[in-house]
Amino acid sequence: LLVVGSGPAGVAAAKEAANQNLNVILIEQDSLLGGNNLADKEFDPSLLQKQLESNGIRVMSRTTAFGVYDNTVVGALERVTDHISNPNTSLPRQRFRTIRAKHIILASGALERHIAFNNNDIPGVMTANAARHYLNRYGVLTGKNIVITTNNDSVYQTAIELHEAGSKVTILDSRKDININLPKEIELHLETLPLSINGSKKIESLDVCKVNDKTHKNTIICDQVLVSGGWSPIVHLVSHRGIKPVWNEDNLCFVPGDIKENITVVGSARGIWNTDDCVESGIVGANEAMNTLGIDKKEISFPSVGGWSNPINALYEVKSNKFPSK
């Protein structure tokens, strides 16, 4: 069994399969295991690696799966010495790996989407999840006066952690109502959009407007703008097999279509956002693999796509008079 991705779903799938005595390889393109768990301040990737290896799982970090071919063959690139300042000359810089698996579990995750609005590409603009990784993985607070603009629930934990780290945080949410508890120090503006960033080499302020009134603007002084326009499952590896992604209207993203080969997609790559549901999907995915291989026969049922408390709102761009959308 080959597992691609070491986030919550991939790890759960690998452990479940290893517990059933399957020969498991887990590959991860990052130098550390954990996927989006690396953005959790209490997470220990070295402990996770020890747990996986103690279960007999072969772990290959710094290894990117770049293609899925006929008969569940996967092409992967392992970066052997790129990260070493003075590498052993007997070692290659990189290795090309051909992995022939009987079943593939894709736990490749999802990418946070940006939102198009005026002057949104100057230094100081990044996705909300990137700022959370900087804070908890690298110990870097990316701004002192931060505005987060969103249409979904995923930014709220980030906002709380940035506030606890000492930043002043303001949230602009395009939705009308949400049911999330926030510290009173965090300002929340509902039905509010980012209109234009002011500044050239750095952010000086952000002009904002209401969803139903873009002619009247307010200005918020800030030094950083974080953006989350939703999440897109990473489905390109199943697309290599000619499997067309399917639009999911409730979650505003493409999810993998029906797969008839020995490939199972789990976690946020399947459009599942809640961490506990991702773990469950990994366990279910491993059981599906064992069913397919004739090792075991269990009733399986994947968690539903989605998982946020409040529905996402469609927001891809904010039109302005300066740059009207065609």
Functional labels for PLM-detected ranges:
Residues 1-326:
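Residues forming the flavin
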